[in-house]
Regions:
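FIC/Doc superfamily catalytic core
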Residues: 1-220
Length: 220
């Protein structure tokens, strides 16, 4: 299916229109996963005029982050931690960087702590350095790229390196990794709609690896 999509994209004369349209749709859906809700109408209006709707601004920041990441990957053929930091900075409009303070926990809808990510700043830096190598060094792992993408996504979300924007940054990394591997020429895969449709299963799959080592459900 990815090869089919890649072939179809090559027949479209104006890639910028396609990138702009699909990045806004992906941005809207990715943000909805984290309950940042806006309408397409709001987005297209905000794309051409200044407004103060915070939800629209967050979604537009996602679209800008995705496009910025795509340009980096296309030009440098790498996706390094310094690039991931730039993408998250675009999403959150701040320079907080990787977490340095303890206290971050993931809670469910009942306000119960379901996962505590690494708290020590040096451990976070070491884990992200390891992930950077896994993303960019083909000799580090010879797994199929789609399997690697699932592992990268799990590792990033479990390290949870930022104070905020981890989910959205992680979903941008998914798309950029497919571009990096040559499976996509443009960042036009609309992954977040699928996650919205299977949101409970998505979070269960991530948690299943943490609690039971169940990689199969996440990867498949």
């Amino acid at each position: 299916h990815l090869a089919e999509l890649k072939g179809v994209v090559k027949t479209i004369p104006n890639e910028q229109i396609l990138i702009n349209t699909l990045s806004l749709q992906e941005a809207k859906s990715s943000s909805e996963i984290e309950n940042i809700v806006t309408t397409h109408d709001d987005l297209y209006k905000e794309n051409i005029m200044i407004d103060t709707n915070p939800a629209s601004k967050e979604v537009l920041n996602y679209a800008k982050g995705l496009k910025m990441g795509f340009e980096i990957v296309r030009n440098e053929r790498l996706l390094l931690n310094k690039h991931i930091l730039l993408i998250q900075e675009q999403l959150e409009a701040n320079k907080a960087g990787f977490r340095t303070q303890a206290g971050t926990k993931l809670i469910n809808s009942y306000n119960e702590v379901v996962y505590t990510p690494p708290q020590d700043k040096d451990e976070i830096l070491n884990l992200m350095a390891n992930l950077e190598k896994f993303i960019n060094d083909p000799e580090f792992s010879e797994l199929d790229p789609l399997t690697k993408m699932a592992i990268i996504h799990y590792q990033f979300e479990s390290i949870h390196p930022f104070y905020d924007g981890n989910g959205r940054t992680g979903r941008i990394i998914n798309i950029l990794y497919l571009v990096l591997q040559g499976l996509l020429d443009l960042p036009v895969l609309y992954l977040s709609r699928y996650i919205i449709q299977h949101k409970t299963d998505y979070y269960k799959a991530l948690q299943g690896v943490r609690t039971n080592g169940d990689w199969e459900t996440l990867i498949l």
